[in-house]
């Protein structure tokens, strides 16, 4: 197995760091780092559901993805200034939402929404996969918050963990967790979202200027799923620590006689 420009083996993830309680106000707030890629993921419960969801008795989960203007080497203009979201931003936002909805029983939320926000602070490839992986941890913390507040119909609505990783063919070799330098010249580029129960949520894959055989697809998936297993361990280790956010306030104490 060959080494890469950054010294990693083909099947080796970049250093993964998950920091919970990164900001104070959201119910779930996480900074996730895949090497030099850093994404802030928050999960915020809000009252109500979209209009088309009203009356269903079920909640909703939505996600938004964005990059800070200086997340890359060259500053980009804020999309809010442009007045429109790029197709890439919309695609990744929907991907994150779909991925997280695969692991939660929305009926347990009642008619309430969890809004997930993923903001890329620094980009070096794999921002969407880092966002999905970190957003799951933020969601788990938001569920802990809602359960402590007595706002869930089912105190354990999460059925599985969700993680994502990039994988591709670079220099004729199958490699996992591509940096920007590798991703920009990959012959095959793929993103894999999986559950810790061994099932797949989504696969996004393209031959970048070249076709590839079924046997390569199988090898790509095998390497991606092996990497996701390592990400699940990182998620579990992070979530094993005490809840980092502010605990919900309980009901007000009964008034004293005569007050």
UniProtKB/Swiss-Prot annotation:
Q: Which InterPro entries match?
A: ExoRNase_PH_dom1, ExoRNase_PH_dom2, ExoRNase_PH_dom2_sf, PNPase/RNase_PH_dom_sf, Ribosomal_Su5_D2-typ_SF, RNase_PH, RNase_PH_bac-type, RNase_PH_CS
Keyword tRNA-binding in record: yes
Binding, phosphate: 88, 126-128
Q: Which UniProt keywords apply?
A: Nucleotidyltransferase, RNA-binding, rRNA processing, Transferase, tRNA processing, tRNA-binding
**Alphabetical list of PROSITE patterns matching this protein:** RIBONUCLEASE_PH
Question: What is this enzyme's EC?
Answer: 2.7.7.56
Q: Which GO terms describe its molecular function?
A: 3'-5'-RNA exonuclease activity; tRNA binding; tRNA nucleotidyltransferase activity
Catalytic reaction annotation: tRNA(n+1) + phosphate = tRNA(n) + a ribonucleoside 5'-diphosphate
- Tell me the GO BP annotations in alphabetical order: rRNA catabolic process; rRNA processing; tRNA processing
NCBIfam families given in the database record = RNasePH (TIGR01966)
Task: State the family named in the UniProt similarity comment for this chain.
Answer: Belongs to the RNase PH family.
Q: What does this protein do?
A: Phosphorolytic 3'-5' exoribonuclease that plays an important role in tRNA 3'-end maturation. Removes nucleotide residues following the 3'-CCA terminus of tRNAs; can also add nucleotides to the ends of RNA molecules by using nucleoside diphosphates as substrates, but this may not be physiologically important. Probably plays a role in initiation of 16S rRNA degradation (leading to ribosome degradation) during starvation.
Q: How does it assemble?
A: Homohexameric ring arranged as a trimer of dimers.
Q: What is this protein called?
A: Ribonuclease PH
Please state the gene responsible for encoding this protein: rph
